[in-house]
């Protein structure tokens, strides 16, 4: 014979007030937790971008140490012809940033190339005929990095490579590797003079200052 557990005749379930209170607590916790998680995720992206711009910058300097110049050869074999280099596997067909920028002007005018065509493979402009020399004391000895990727916000890292070969005394004095950062807008001057810092929430690594 099973014993019967007495039921509290006064306890028929949760009251409406209790349910509303519980839902309010859950909503409050969600309101606190979601922004915290979002902030932590954004901080992780920023940290990743800092690591990657530094890695790209060090690869640029390693290239310089073996070739004797920064990568600026175009598909015809002419040096000091590129103004911008950008990461990722393909050439963008439209402005990947949220605002107009000199970097995109250079890219769309044909004065740019993929970083990988210089640092990962010896194929300026994506071709294999006109290349950096591979023998002698000043030669291409890569790859200098693994295939580059987009930044944590799915936009290219960019390098104002013109600063690596220009002789201007007023412009192009700082060579940067840049991410546009969380807001997607490059606010660092592409024509960087000596006093021009990283702008906005851009994330940058200074490769060279001359």
Each model region followed by its residue ranges:
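Short, glycine/small-hydrophobic-rich surface segments
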Residues: 60-144
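N-terminal single-pass transmembrane signal-anchor helix
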Residues: 10-41, 45, 52, 57
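Soluble non-cytosolic domains of exported or imported proteins
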Residues: 47-50, 139
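N-terminal secretory signal peptides that target proteins for export/translocation
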Residues: 1-9
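Short, surface-exposed interaction loops/tails
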Residues: 2, 46, 143, 150-210
């Amino acid at each position: 014979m099973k014993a019967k557990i007495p039921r509290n005749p006064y306890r028929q379930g949760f009251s409406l007030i209790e349910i509303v209170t519980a839902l309010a607590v859950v909503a409050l916790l969600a309101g606190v937790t979601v922004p915290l998680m979002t902030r932590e995720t954004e901080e992780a992206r920023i940290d990743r971008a800092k690591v990657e711009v530094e890695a790209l910058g060090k690869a640029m300097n390693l290239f310089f140490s073996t070739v004797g110049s920064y990568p600026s050869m175009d598909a015809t074999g002419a040096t000091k012809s590129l103004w911008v280099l950008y990461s990722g596997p393909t050439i963008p067909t439209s402005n990947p940033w949220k605002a107009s920028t000199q970097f995109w002007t250079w890219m769309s005018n044909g004065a740019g190339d993929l970083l990988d065509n210089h640092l990962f493979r010896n194929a300026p402009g994506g071709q294999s005929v006109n290349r950096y020399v591979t023998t002698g004391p000043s030669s291409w000895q890569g790859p200098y990095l693994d295939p580059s990727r987009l930044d944590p916000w799915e936009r290219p890292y960019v390098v104002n490579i013109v600063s690596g070969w220009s002789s201007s005394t007023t412009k192009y004095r700082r060579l940067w590797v840049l991410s546009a950062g969380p807001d997607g807008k490059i606010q660092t001057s592409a024509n960087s003079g000596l006093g021009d810092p990283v702008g906005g929430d851009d994330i940058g690594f200074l490769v060279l200052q001359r």
